[in-house]
């Protein structure tokens, strides 16, 4: 494992794989994890977790060496594949007929998935998308150090797909000493904009880092979201103080634990601060409104290496005639227009136009166009 904030780099496209015969098939989650492990997005991790680290992360939110890490990054294989593997050997990592990397197997073990579900997601309910995915994936985990031997060619957003070393360079070039990261899997609505701009008042730059890996089927498609971010930044943000780049990970929907994970990853991308809002990375009613903020009290800023910025739920207040939160607005609920991505999706699907207090008109236009395309192609 590398030291804090030193980036892992495990990309080697000249790596000789000609003598390696065995292979493990990667699903899309493992494939995106492979890339993020190799490019340093998941520093200090250098591979898929072995049993010791896996148990430690699941039980204590720390690696075996004590470093904070909250989400188990695992490589699941079927019992049949596991039987053909042994510790110490090198195996190719394959997806869609292409070899993307190699793993040096250190560990082959059967996890207690129920325990993982309960501790990581706080539920064993299979209606929870993270738990559902956990149970759907094969039942044996393979741990070991990896090498990425081939970069992905079919990247849907090449100009926005930057490795941590590149985003760090970009922030340096812009002279940003302090950078706040914002994680999103939804179009940015007025509530998000208010929070981002509040944070931008106290730091040099905003890093808008939308997740474009695997999400729930009813989440708005990544290409539509990317276009919505572009029009928003073009029209409503100072260009020299915002940087947009994608986060190619899968969404886990692990709420509080994922908030810690998202913060650690943004530290690797070069952020000094990270925004944690209401029900960060949550789904349904599985987590308390501010549970994702409360979990940070278990760790010091020093050991996280990044400062979390907590925001209350914001809304449009008809009396204040402005965006506000309970910290800044004295008025009652009856004056508050509550904004949420879910609400906007609902309005759009019913053919209604969200009011300008919800969403900027340029964003709404992009979403309507995207929804029409979805209906035609869907």
Curated annotation (Swiss-Prot):
Similarity-based family: Belongs to the sulfate adenylyltransferase family.
Keywords associated with the record: ATP-binding, Nucleotide-binding, Nucleotidyltransferase, Transferase
Top-level EC class: transferase
Source domain of life: Bacteria
Species of the source: Bacillus cereus (strain 03BB102)
Lineage: Bacteria, Bacillati, Bacillota, Bacilli, Bacillales
GO process annotations (BP): hydrogen sulfide biosynthetic process; sulfate assimilation
Nucleotide-binding in keyword set: yes
Pathways per UniProt: Sulfur metabolism; hydrogen sulfide biosynthesis; sulfite from sulfate: step 1/3
Keyword Protease attributed: no
Record protein name field: Sulfate adenylyltransferase
CDD domains documented for this protein: ATPS (cd00517)
E.C. code: 2.7.7.4
UniProt GO molecular function: ATP binding; sulfate adenylyltransferase (ATP) activity
